């Protein structure tokens, strides 16, 4: 029944791809099939982190159903992006689905762009490391990120010009521990001699985000260094102490305040990701082993498509 429902939903989403370029609209009316983009997006553009974060789900749906249309839609996006000019070797965050031109040349591995790069690596992993095209696109992007988006503070710490980059976890742990609540702010900057702090009031909130805990889990699985479990436990205690409310959990408005104010919102990713990654961090490696499972950007596990895997009902042609 879940596969049937997934196919029904995917069929309702396919009209979003009916653009001159094949780059989908950000939104589609499920009844009429009419698509549109966010009004605030530059020059009527679609957003890299949205149209570039479909590969895993559509690839898996083609595998399960034997219908190549979903696979072809996402591969078309990849082929088009490969032909585009890339300033500094990176992909700008806005692409006009009518003209096939970049809406502007702003690049980032924070919001609007982050999960596109994530999915390049995960597409390779999901393919049992046979999708060499995705891996090359990822490697080339990482080289450009290291060259153009990383700088050092006066104290020698590295900062990436983004608010959610998962790779620099030591820095993430640092900025969590300089706050009153031991929870990290939404974003941080290096300002003069000050290291890794949220400068503006609008950056000081924590809304139960999972990215740092997600990274603790990956690093625990890769290294089994106990400090990652220790840091995860500290995060769990801080969330329990400062974010639990009578009806669940809430974000806080200022992680630097010892008497935080709640925002009265429990984000959906708190259950889907934050708590799931905390649970996995303290579970054995035999629970969702990484050689068999890849997590999409919202922490839903999808199986690695091993050629020898006979437990799935996929179409051999898709494999």
Label the predicted regions.
Residues 1-319:
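Glycan-recognition and catalytic cores of secretory/periplasmic carbohydrate-active enzymes
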